[in-house]
């Protein structure tokens, strides 16, 4: 008696589990999920509340440097970039703006717990702007001279810093 050869796997079943099919399936699922999360409303309703009051800036230069490097998160005059409407990035951008406004908002000057006394120190220590902000907003990149000028102006406007 001759040994019967093992049946060959059909081409259809081999193709079903090929790496290319897996990659196509995974890509389809990822695209579907990316489309589905666009319907989550958080992060798309970009609201800039009215400006209630601003601090008495020590100079127009300090204000201009602040607007350029800080105001998107620390004022009610946020310029919302196109990617702030695409989830999940919109969720992160909205969270950063909400947190920034809650911590320090120059558009609601005089509100309780809204002093800028540590603003100069935060910039001087390199904590602000956040590490990922400048690559996405090149206009916010300050030269060393501009950074020093901003720190001096923030100290003059709000007090605080290392010179107190």
Which functions belong to the PLM regions below?
Residues 24-41:
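Hydrophobic membrane-insertion alpha-helices, especially the h-region
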Residues 45-66:
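Electrostatic cytochrome c docking/interface patches
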Residues 66-78, 128, 150:
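The canonical Cys-X-X-Cys-His
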Residues 80-95:
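Acidic helix-start/capping segments at beta-turn-to-alpha-helix junctions
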């Amino acid at each position: 008696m001759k040994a019967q050869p093992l049946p060959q796997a059909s081409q259809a079943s081999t193709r079903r589990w090929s790496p290319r099919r897996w990659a196509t399936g995974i890509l389809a699922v990822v695209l579907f999920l990316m489309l589905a999360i666009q319907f989550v409303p958080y992060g798309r309703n970009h609201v800039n509340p009215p400006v209630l009051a601003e601090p008495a800036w020590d100079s127009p230069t300090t204000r201009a440097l602040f607007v350029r490097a800080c105001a998107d998160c620390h004022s009610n005059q946020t310029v919302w970039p196109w990617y702030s409407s695409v989830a999940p990035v919109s969720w992160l951008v909205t969270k950063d703006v909400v947190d920034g406004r809650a911590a320090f908002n120059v558009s609601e000057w005089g509100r309780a717990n809204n002093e800028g006394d540590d603003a100069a120190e935060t910039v001087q220590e390199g904590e602000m702007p956040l590490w990922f902000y400048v690559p996405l907003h090149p206009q916010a990149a300050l030269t060393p001279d501009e950074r020093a000028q901003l720190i001096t102006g923030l100290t003059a406007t709000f007090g605080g810093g290392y010179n107190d």
